[in-house]
């Protein structure tokens, strides 16, 4: 049985965290943070987080500060972030996307929208990781083939030089 993907839910409202877990169901393992500072602590310790659901408006450290730290460590290259926030202004949405979020869901939201967008983000990042692995494997294979070709060519040149430098025997 495959291990469940881990989702970090960052929201200062315990009710919101519980609601998101209930919407997403038992197919995931959940980590919870009540503020941005706690989220960063968890992200520093855990390398197996598949997705972050992030509220923007929180005490101590807001969602934008969390995104800034994630950018500094390039965590968003590996972990998609979906903002779920009651922030109404378009500037917040634009700023969140500029900071690298995979998606933005405004509250109030429909259950099916949250479920679908989480699945889509996880699927897209899994495909991206698989493509990155394939490209990396191809680069290593080409590099290995190039080294092998250089070795063969150097032996051919060496044999040619030996053949050229030998005195020709006349009969």
Tell where the protein language model's regions lie, with residue ranges.
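Single conserved hydrophobic/aromatic residue that forms the stacking wall/gate
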Residues: 163-171
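C-terminal output helix
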Residues: 91, 109-118
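Short amphipathic alpha-helix used as the core "switch/output" element in two-component signaling
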Residues: 41-42, 64-77
């Amino acid at each position: 049985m495959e291990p469940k993907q881990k989702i970090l839910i960052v929201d200062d409202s315990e009710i919101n965290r519980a609601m998101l877990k209930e919407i997403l169901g038992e197919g995931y393992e959940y980590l919870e943070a009540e503020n941005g500072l706690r989220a960063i602590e968890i992200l520093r310790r855990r390398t197996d987080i598949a997705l972050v659901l992030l509220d923007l408006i929180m005490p101590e450290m807001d969602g934008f500060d969390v995104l800034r730290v994630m950018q500094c460590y390039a965590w968003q290259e590996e972990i998609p972030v979906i903002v779920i926030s009651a922030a109404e202004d378009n500037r917040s949405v634009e700023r969140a996307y500029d900071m690298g979020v995979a998606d933005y869901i405004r509250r109030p939201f429909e259950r099916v929208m949250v479920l679908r967008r989480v699945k889509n983000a996880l699927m897209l990042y899994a495909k991206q990781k698989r493509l990155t692995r394939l490209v990396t494997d191809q680069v290593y294979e080409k590099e290995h083939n190039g080294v092998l070709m250089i070795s063969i060519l150097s032996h051919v040149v060496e044999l040619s030089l030996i053949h050229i430098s030998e005195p020709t025997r006349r009969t």
